[in-house]
Amino acid sequence: MMRDFVVVGLSHRTAPVEIREHLAVAPDRLEQELREIAANGRLDEALLISTCNRVELYVTSANPIAASQIAKDALAKRLPEAADDDVLYQERGIDVVRHIFRVASSLDSLVIGEPQILGQVKEAFDAAKGAGTMGTLLGRCFTQSFATAKRVRNETGIAEGTVSVSSIACELAKKIFGNLEGRRTLLIGAGEMGEAAARSLQQTGTNLHVINRSEERARALAESCAGRAVPYERLTTELADADVVIVSTASPKFILTPELMKSVVRSRRRRPLFIIDIAVPRDVDPRVANMDNVFVYDVDDLQQVAEENLAVRAREAALAERIIEEELDAFSAWRRSLELA
């Protein structure tokens, strides 16, 4: 019996960040998570993608109906009690291949044309290989998704002047103030997202302060972006002095809590503080948004800014969709050759 593809997942299109963060898996946990999912031996292959805007489990099996239920159960058990499992979507067969081609090419991203997703898909691919859950079908499917994404970038203008979640966060900060020049921006986190935000902020003339648990990483990033590194112990002082805060760490727990922010709010003397949280799981406790003169935005609040970018890319996205259908035909031909063999 021929094996077939199944994907079960959720994304920014089906679930808000307060649900997505419950399913998020840190990059260094992907392999272990896959081993646990595949432990019952009922799935032939498995691959897990986890980003700030999506969590998707790809599997193959000779019994796709049973595989769908296994994959759904693996994700649904981590949903919060208040969430309905209809936030999870499912695809089977060739629709799964089309879906991952679109995901890798950033056509299903919050920000169409953003460059980070391809690296995240490759990271998931490597984790599946490391976990021993990658086989012929997923291997070919994902390898071809990388080639498809490369064609889309090379043959369309979808990435011209491209923006990312991080740069949209900076765009939002500029919209709030009109101009960031001379304003103090505190960046908490010096990982990939933080680095992308720092690069965008560098062009605004803001007074950039970078804080990270690893002071060495904070210093390296600050020096490369004409900013200033600050010891983590000065977090509350920096929060008291900042005009805008962009936070993106890999912490599994909230970084900014009401308890921490209480003294910050008091010392600011009614001066408003704008916090943009681009981490998933979130770095800012939702209760912070209820505090006086504190305004919190999360990744879902970036949607409106992203949609302004979408109209510009609509024509290029149509060209990209044609490339995906061509690559899908090529993949289908490869599958048929396996059946004949």
What do the PLM-derived regions correspond to, one by one?
Residues 83-181:
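Glycine/serine-rich phosphate-binding loop and adjoining beta1-alpha1 elements at the start
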Residues 249-251, 279-280:
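Short glycine-/small-residue-rich Rossmann-like dinucleotide-binding loops
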